[in-house]
Amino acid sequence: MSAKAIIEQLKRLCVLHEHLLTLSEEKTEALKAGKTKELSNILTKEQKYIQAITQTEDDRIKTTSAFLGYSENNTISACIAKTSGSEKEELEQLYESLSQVLGRLKKVNEMNRQLTRDALQFISISYDMLVPKENNFNYSKSIKAELPKSSKMKLFDSKA
């Protein structure tokens, strides 16, 4: 069996991940600029790419399993070891390319996570500063009325 189907799926995965990387970089700029509508559109597009990546990856796993004879080690490295010639070189190049794109995507997503966390912290702090605290430390009739009668101290006990 030829590794052509695996090569085609890896090419598709590389393209999809590169598009996802571009969207993640756009998301970084939208987060920095505070553009919520643009961010919402980007998230919708990201979901579509994630679904396509998931489907392609499932297909790749099935194809890899069939190519390797349904072994437990259904990895691209195992496919590279089983192939030779131009297919082997192409698989190695695609593997390296996909690894690099995934590494960059991981870094960009980590930065986006940090930007989102910082924005949420800022919103939380701003909200806490604008909203008054519920605890009122002033004396009032309501506090006096809540005290039980037995806890009142008397200076002079007339029954003694």
From Swiss-Prot:
GO annotation, biological process: bacterial-type flagellum assembly
Keyword Phosphoprotein appears in the UniProt entry: yes
Residues recorded as bearing Phosphotyrosine in the entry: Y49
Gene3D superfamilies for this protein: FlgN-like
Keywords tagged on the record: Bacterial flagellum biogenesis, Phosphoprotein
Listed Pfam families: FlgN (PF05130)
Its biological purpose: May be involved in the assembly, structure, or function of the flagellum. May polymerize to form a filamentous structure that is part of the flagellum.
Protein name in the entry: Uncharacterized protein YvyG
Gene: yvyG
